[in-house]
């Protein structure tokens, strides 16, 4: 076993959710409360990559804290009846890792109860730890706090853990904690995102199967 604990991001790493749920939800929110404003799927991916969703809402759409609360409530209602599908192969990775004695954690910008629902609906093993959007803002990634808490609760050393994430906040969090990071490149083909992740991540995987090969094959695969 290369790593005793795998820390998964949720959206666009474990489940295909931005293109199918989160972006359509945001477009509906803009139509309802910011008529005339728009956001393409590529723009949504890029702004979530950097500077992040909250900064995008502040900077691009002028949302104050009250508007952010309204957007969050709109989003929470929208996702409550829509379950994203796990990427093919993710379930097999998690089941094999758990069967070999490994642990699974989730650090995400989705709410913890939605994450657990998605895991159940997709037949994924229940995570040992979940840190989601319900945490205070200063305890959400890219803050190192949730990963520091994983280290504290498990007693593992940084090199026994692998963070798997598709966006920069996860990378920044892992780097701040000295934890190995694997970039999940299977959600989109946006050059700016792929270029950054390939340049700065020692591990970059364009497919779920490539990640599985690295984790479980003796030789590993990049």
Model regions and ranges:
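N-terminal helical cap/lid subdomain that shapes the substrate entry/recognition surface
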Residues: 2-92, 99-100
